[in-house]
């Protein structure tokens, strides 16, 4: 999921709950 690192970083700033999903 290294390619998702940037996506996750931007998403976690908007919705930290996404990481839990």
Curated annotation (Swiss-Prot):
Keywords: Hydrolase. It comes from the Bacteria. Disulfide bonds: none annotated. It is an enzyme of class 3 (hydrolase). GO terms for molecular function: nitrilase activity. It catalyses: a nitrile + 2 H2O = a carboxylate + NH4(+). Its EC number is 3.5.5.1. Belongs to the carbon-nitrogen hydrolase superfamily. Nitrilase family. Acts on many kinds of nitrile compounds such as aliphatic, aromatic, and heterocyclic mononitriles or dinitriles. Prefers S-(-)-2-(4'-isobutylphenyl)-propionitrile to R-(+)-2-(4'-isobutylphenyl)-propionitrile as the substrate. This is Nitrilase. It comes from Acinetobacter sp. (strain AK226).
